[in-house]
């Protein structure tokens, strides 16, 4: 990030009415921008045109032309190279969802060896895309986290546009998880209607095959809720024509449809609900990521999640000792993170950015790997962290969290960030 882009981004957030927005974007677009040429599209262009206004876009296959996975995982006919994949990753244990079975608003999963999944996939194709085992979709395979393969860095090259990735930076520090996934499945596999975890951004690249995306801008999903307040499993279902079951359906807008070709890269903004279909035999690489641009959306989402938990167990509020603590425990189980872990997430990123800024102000470049996007990015990140942490520390539910063992204390960390924001004005 350069100084001009940082200034632009900081002004953008100052001009917002609510310093911690509830998670929308700009005006609803009529279509999605297609970005053709890598050399003609900068990181600053992406920040200003898509990241800040929270709008989707599609990058051409030229952006992923050098990826090893596009050379090795795919045959000359553009199909999955089953023989190579089975030889390379056959022993890996992978999660597989049955797209033909609904379990709440998702699909039931099982685990099998990648070798067995490839065998199923080949049989499925030979059976005219049908099987008594159902329509199985390999989803959420943590290849980067789990693989013992030595050449993982050649599978893909992280595009600079997505390199400010706090979510995976945090989990890499803990060395226990990540949000980098491989998806693979035959024609007809699909993902039900959803918004991405923690209201993260995501990006998705088709290594081979073709996808159809149905996008709904933030807020549009409200018209799709049924009379009980639940979102649909499948937005194309004729069930949605029942106005008694879906009383707001007449107010809904048509989705924005995107066809993603082989090699193309889709940017999914924060809070955009979507439904995705594989139109061909398809393999994709997908990342979820959070940074200073959607951190407020993540914080807003976590507050909503806690409120939902509190509503469900409201009747035990007066009789259950440590009711607020139990709500945090339930939230952690259901959402994957609670307020305590969110503070730890903020702290890890904040301390790394404060170190980069301290080194920069001293004229010491330090470890160049500490932040690929540079000193101005660190300064911008610190400002966003300060804004959100200021909201966190005054939140009544966070104030009920036992922070006695936190180091530094939240108020102390906030002061460090605010001091750093002031110091960064000179950069």
UniProtKB/Swiss-Prot annotation:
Obligatory cofactor(s): Fe(2+)
Listed name of the protein: 2-oxoglutarate and iron-dependent oxygenase JMJD4
Swiss-Prot/TrEMBL catalytic activity: L-lysyl-[protein] + 2-oxoglutarate + O2 = 4-hydroxy-L-lysyl-[protein] + succinate + CO2
Domain JmjC: 147-306
InterPro entries xref list: Cupin_8, JmjC_dom, JMJD6_ArgDemeth/LysHydrox
Family, similarity comment: Belongs to the JMJD6 family.
Location (main, coarse): cytoplasm
Disulfide pattern: none
Oligomeric form and interacting partners: Interacts with ETF1. Interacts with the ETF1-GSPT1 complex.
Record's function text: Catalyzes the 2-oxoglutarate and iron-dependent C4-lysyl hydroxylation of ETF1 at 'Lys-63' thereby promoting the translational termination efficiency of ETF1. Not essential for embryonic stem cell (ESC) maintenance and the embryonic and postnatal development.
GO cellular component: cytoplasm
Gene Ontology molecular function: 2-oxoglutarate-dependent dioxygenase activity; metal ion binding; peptidyl-lysine 4-dioxygenase activity
Residues annotated as binding Fe cation: 194, 196, 274
Phenotype of gene-disrupted mutants: Mice are born at the expected Mendelian rate and are healthy, fertile and physiologically normal. Embryonic stem cells (ESCs) exhibit normal colony morphology and cell proliferation rates and maintain normal expression of pluripotent genes.
Lineage: Eukaryota, Metazoa, Chordata, Craniata, Vertebrata
GO BP: any one term: positive regulation of translational termination
Coiled-coil region: none
Name of the encoding gene: Jmjd4
Keywords recorded for this protein, A-Z: Cytoplasm, Dioxygenase, Iron, Metal-binding, Oxidoreductase
